């Protein structure tokens, strides 16, 4: 009997740097590449039309690239546990390959499939290629616990073995001795479905701002590297109005779906840096996006409650308000704050927003204004954001809501001043909120302050054509900062440790978040609504009080707390999330 192999695509939707697929092909007589439409995407999450379209485009591109190798993609609907026993028998499978999935749900699913494969006499190949590092080795190096500060994480990876270079792309030469059995009715049986076939109404759906697939990902990577003039002097580009728009060099959705190998990106950045800097060693900060990604993957891999507040050993238990009406206004871009509403409109229309825009809307929903749980915001991002990833999405929301990682609860984004500083003319607002197009720049971020005559000229009456602000930002943010302060002081007293949480004497110093203060942001009061400060809590691993704390319900931080120095400005202003550092993706 010949060697009949199957490679199961999940993430990792590419032919370049795919070690599991490459090894699966070696020595095989037949190869079938399958994608099962269910596990995470169609099953457990509410996924919006833009994300589905991106996935289907990825699958279409993968199928097109496999066709060039006289192969095809087999798209199969169902649950993996039901599908594979049938395929093992029907195709006489002897070998199955998969890319390692570090997320708890994925590990549980894969363990079940490996058990079924073993029972059927099928060899299973698992290789790491969605992350740069073996996350278990990072945790082992840290005494069995995931590092919960980025600085500690950097220290650990600096001790790791050098990264392996990407494996060669699957080409006709690689696959030449391996055939794919195909039938005339392949498209009917195994073709990539359309959005309509999946039940989506596509009337009025605009063209994709982010086309899915490996081909597009590699094109963008080359463009991305070409415009990296910042590498020469290693300076970050300054944020401006254009930064808020989708870039033809953006990479985050492609890394999330594995259309682009993170290792390829890493080594391309390294090569470019060495070329410009004459072979000097690149700093870790060059890889900002990739390393923050690894940081959150590492924190989440052994924590099935990572996306929940309750029962999550690294998350502070905060008594958030339940307010479905306010949540809906935020999610649908009806807050009455043009900056927030424009961001949420862009997210719903295009499936992507700039990382600092993510900071603004996350702060507004949680600790800044509405005091609604980060879990609710995370679910909205999971539905709408192309690059939403279970580990990174949950980690970002915990961080931005001051529920875990770095706590900086005095730092609050002003929903008027932050946007005005970024885009003084208001072009971004006019693009996504055309109802406000007629307002002059002076009032476009706070149109409720415009005299009635100006509102009439703009053909937009506040409270009629566009909503009034749903909250008083100055009052809400001041109240919420006090709430957060009390939570951390209570936690600090309970733990018998001091808490560093005070407004610095120099409000315009460079240690503040984005360097903003109440005094230098128009539209923000100086009484705390945008004040800078430090609420940093550093973690010391190996705390024996974890179980006791969980039972007490005060906190489920899971690690010791100690007052510490502020992070460096580089660390302090890192953007967290699927798009995680300014110089890395756009």
Curated annotation (Swiss-Prot):
Motif (LIR 3): 151-156
Inducers of expression: Expression is regulated by light and circadian rhythms and osicllates diurnally. Peak expression in the suprachiasma nucleus (SCN) and eye at the day/night transition (CT12). Levels decrease with BMAL1-CLOCK inhibition as part of the autoregulatory feedback loop.
Crosslinked positions (Glycyl lysine isopeptide (Lys-Gly) (interchain with G-Cter in ubiquitin)): 11, 107, 159, 329, 485, 565
Effect of residue 387 to N: Loss of binding to KL001
SUPFAM superfamilies per UniProt: Cryptochrome/photolyase FAD-binding domain (SSF48173), Cryptochrome/photolyase, N-terminal domain (SSF52425)
Renumbered residue ranges of the record's region Disordered: 552-586
Motif mapping: LIR 11: 430-435
Cofactor note: Binds 1 FAD per subunit. Only a minority of the protein molecules contain bound FAD. Contrary to the situation in photolyases, the FAD is bound in a shallow, surface-exposed pocket. Binds 1 5,10-methenyltetrahydrofolate (MTHF) non-covalently per subunit.
Sequence motif LIR 12, location on chain: 486-491
Post-translational modification: Phosphorylation on Ser-247 by MAPK is important for the inhibition of CLOCK-BMAL1-mediated transcriptional activity. Phosphorylation by CSNK1E requires interaction with PER1 or PER2. Phosphorylation at Ser-71 and Ser-280 by AMPK decreases protein stability. Phosphorylation at Ser-568 exhibits a robust circadian rhythm with a peak at CT8, increases protein stability, prevents SCF(FBXL3)-mediated degradation and is antagonized by interaction with PRKDC. Ubiquitinated by the SCF(FBXL3) and SCF(FBXL21) complexes, regulating the balance between degradation and stabilization. The SCF(FBXL3) complex is mainly nuclear and mediates ubiquitination and subsequent degradation of CRY1. In contrast, cytoplasmic SCF(FBXL21) complex-mediated ubiquitination leads to stabilize CRY1 and counteract the activity of the SCF(FBXL3) complex. The SCF(FBXL3) and SCF(FBXL21) complexes probably mediate ubiquitination at different Lys residues.
Modified residues (Phosphoserine): 71, 247, 280, 568
Gene Ontology CC annotations of this record: cytoplasm; mitochondrion; nucleus
Annotated phenotype, changing residue 393 to D: Loss of binding to KL001
Binding locations of FAD: 252, 289, 355, 387-389
Function as written in the Swiss-Prot or TrEMBL entry: Transcriptional repressor which forms a core component of the circadian clock. The circadian clock, an internal time-keeping system, regulates various physiological processes through the generation of approximately 24 hour circadian rhythms in gene expression, which are translated into rhythms in metabolism and behavior. It is derived from the Latin roots 'circa' (about) and 'diem' (day) and acts as an important regulator of a wide array of physiological functions including metabolism, sleep, body temperature, blood pressure, endocrine, immune, cardiovascular, and renal function.
PANTHER family: CRYPTOCHROME, CRYPTOCHROME-1
Disease as annotated in the protein's UniProt record: Delayed sleep phase syndrome: A circadian rhythm sleep disorder characterized by sleep-onset insomnia and difficulty in awakening at the desired time. Patients with DSPS have chronic difficulty in adjusting their sleep-onset and wake-up times to occupational, school, and social activities.
Domain observations: The LIR motifs (LC3-interacting region) 3 and 5 are required for its interaction with MAP1LC3B and for its autophagy-mediated degradation.
Name of the protein this chain belongs to: Cryptochrome-1
